[in-house]
Amino acid sequence: MSNRKYFGTDGVRGKVGDTPITPDFVLKLGWAAGKVLARHGSRKIIIGKDTRISGYMLESALEAGLAAAGLSASFTGPMPTPAVAYLTRTFRAEAGIVISASHNPYYDNGIKFFSIDGTKLPDEVEEAIEAELEKPLTCVESAELGKASRIVDAAGRYIEFCKGTFPSELSLNGLKIVVDCANGATYHIAPSVLRELGAKVIAIGCEPDGMNINEECGATDVRQLQARVLAEKADVGLAFDGDGDRLIMVDHLGNKVDGDQILYIIAREGLRQGQLRGGAVGTLMSNMGLEVALKQLGIPFARAKVGDRYVLEMMQAKGWRIGAENSGHVILLDKTTTGDGVIAGLQVLTAIVRNHMSLHDLCSGMKLFPQILVNVRFTGENDPLEDKKVQQITQDVEKELAGRGRVLLRKSGTEPLIRVMVEGEHEETVIALANRIADAVKAAG
């Protein structure tokens, strides 16, 4: 990916009120995107958002920019990111735009784009939009201005799509499920999907006020969900993040079930049903326990760079259909085109119902290795990762683990930090080894 001024790996993102997340810039972004997409024959764009208070402001700015470029916008209202990808496909729109900062606090927001097939825009299109941003804004003739409309029952359409990924011969009758929607975009989606499939649903995190999105709730903080699952004696808990593309689960004992475990369950069930095509893709941060468990099942496993974009790229390159990050991004290409928390949850619930097993028991075939992450701040000019002593100690630790553990050193993309990750079978050993490497990194930095 070339150097860019505004687009990151997940669109344009930042703090509301600071460039680039300002009304004037987003208007210009809408215009620039409109000009580029119009060259590809575009005339209709789908726009969705999560529940942040700033979404209304940014939505209006995007609409004005697109209209000035001659493109019409259809609005979904608050909807999960994967729902916008789905609606972009079904409405044959030329692109979809989501106003969201995913799992970030309410004072952040972002703009990300989907192409006509529901996948993220190609790099070259994003680069063309950046180039257009450098030009002065011009408006098309009045007769060519874009129009605005709302999609009738966007939520109902997406609810039916989600339900369609659950086997028609099964139901969730008899299951008590707690669902935490992070006061985000799934608040009016996930509870309805689960209830209509027969579950008894206890919903939390479903009262968005524009500022409580992801606040001590949802996939990034499952403590409320864990407590409620235990208090209600529920069978299972599901937690989504603010824009609904992540899923973390909780079993009936209150244990957290992360993206690695969810990927294991879905891969194992796919194998049992004869529906698994190829292997599974994780990331450099995926727990080694996942790799070991899949190997025991004879399922190939590959690691992509951290980021759902890179997971998807590797899946497409290998022709594989399932992949996930341990943070809860689960991509199931046989079901949809992007990470979808609700649909991922339904696939795990399918395994629970079909096998008459609890979530806890479905996870039992995979043992999570103790994983220790130490962040080391460095301020010197020297790169600690290039230091000979750091490299030697890292090699020594890898030899000591003898194939029953992993070492990963990587730089943070946002701070002057080296992240030291060590995992292995015994926690005390892992802690000692991680600290040994961290001390060497500190000395080098």
From Swiss-Prot:
Highest taxon of source: Bacteria
UniProt entry tagged with the keyword Endoplasmic reticulum: no
Free-text remark on how the cofactor is bound: Binds 1 Mg(2+) ion per subunit.
Annotated residues for binding of Mg(2+): S102, D241, D243, D245
SUPFAM superfamilies: Phosphoglucomutase, C-terminal domain, Phosphoglucomutase, first 3 domains
Reactions catalysed: alpha-D-glucosamine 1-phosphate = D-glucosamine 6-phosphate
Phosphoserine modifications at: S102
Entries under InterPro entries matching the protein: A-D-PHexomutase_a/b/a-I, A-D-PHexomutase_a/b/a-I/II/III, A-D-PHexomutase_a/b/a-II, A-D-PHexomutase_a/b/a-III, A-D-PHexomutase_C, A-D-PHexomutase_C_sf, A-D-PHexomutase_CS, Alpha-D-phosphohexomutase_SF
A Pfam cross-reference name: PGM_PMM_I
Active-site positions on this chain: S102 (phosphoserine intermediate)
GO biological process, one term: UDP-N-acetylglucosamine biosynthetic process
A molecular function (GO) term: magnesium ion binding
One Gene Ontology cellular component annotation held by this UniProt entry: cytosol
Needed co-factor(s): Mg(2+)
Sorted UniProt keywords: Isomerase, Magnesium, Metal-binding, Phosphoprotein
Enzyme Commission number: 5.4.2.10
PTMs per UniProt: Activated by phosphorylation.
Root EC class: isomerase
Role summary: Catalyzes the conversion of glucosamine-6-phosphate to glucosamine-1-phosphate.
Family: Belongs to the phosphohexose mutase family.
Protein name, UniProt field: Phosphoglucosamine mutase
Phylogenetic lineage: Bacteria, Pseudomonadati, Pseudomonadota, Gammaproteobacteria, Enterobacterales
Gene name as annotated: glmM
